[in-house]
């Protein structure tokens, strides 16, 4: 969507509050934004979600770059540097060593924050080794429907997919379903699924 474009600026018709006249306002490309960066990033995420409702509904709009961290919000310079650093990282599919690289990086971050959170991590994270044992016990097959009533960050469902693929099965023939009552954890789970290339999972 135009509002989320990285390299291209975009134009918007805006109504003047005082005169009522319609004016054409030019917005810079996202990587060139220097003022109100947090607000522009929030709007970019909203635009991406609105353009991909089936996959991203309620996933990105909860992210707020203007939220206080400790006693302050991140300033424009910090956020602008954060945005520009993304340009230094090759993020095209062809640049990845393996298809699930982004998903693996995301899971590493989940584990990192889980280790830092201590007991609170139990709300969204189960160690991968424990999950693997559970999956092996279940021994999923094609045409099965898998349901995780406490999905957390989605590790069980992802490892179920991986297990089937490792054993020569077609993950597309597996029905993945999960439930999570904590909103932020649900968003983490949805994003984890998408970054692992799983768009057909039903997470509620």
What residue spans do the PLM features occupy?
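Non-catalytic, mostly N-terminal accessory regions of nucleic-acid modification and defense proteins
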Residues: 1-142, 204
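Conserved S-adenosyl-L-methionine
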Residues: 120-204
């Amino acid at each position: 969507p135009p509002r989320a474009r990285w390299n291209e600026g975009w134009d918007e018709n805006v109504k003047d509050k005082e005169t009522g006249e319609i004016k054409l306002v030019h917005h810079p490309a996202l990587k060139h934004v220097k003022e109100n960066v947090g607000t522009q990033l929030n709007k970019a995420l909203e635009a991406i979600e609105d353009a991909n409702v089936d996959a991203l509904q309620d996933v990105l709009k909860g992210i707020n770059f203007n939220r206080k961290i400790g006693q302050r919000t991140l300033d424009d310079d910090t956020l602008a540097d954060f945005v520009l650093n993304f340009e230094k990282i090759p993020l095209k599919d062809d640049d990845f060593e393996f298809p699930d690289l982004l998903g693996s990086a995301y899971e590493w971050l989940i584990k990192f924050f889980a280790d830092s959170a201590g007991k609170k991590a139990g709300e969204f994270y189960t160690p991968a080794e424990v999950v693997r044992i559970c999956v092996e016990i279940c021994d999923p097959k094609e045409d099965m429907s898998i349901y995780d009533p406490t999905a957390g960050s989605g590790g069980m469902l992802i490892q179920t997919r991986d297990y089937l693929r490792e054993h020569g099965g077609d993950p597309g023939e597996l029905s993945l379903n999960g439930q999570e009552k904590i909103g932020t954890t649900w968003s983490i789970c949805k994003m984890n699924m998408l970054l692992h290339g799983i768009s057909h999972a039903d997470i509620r």
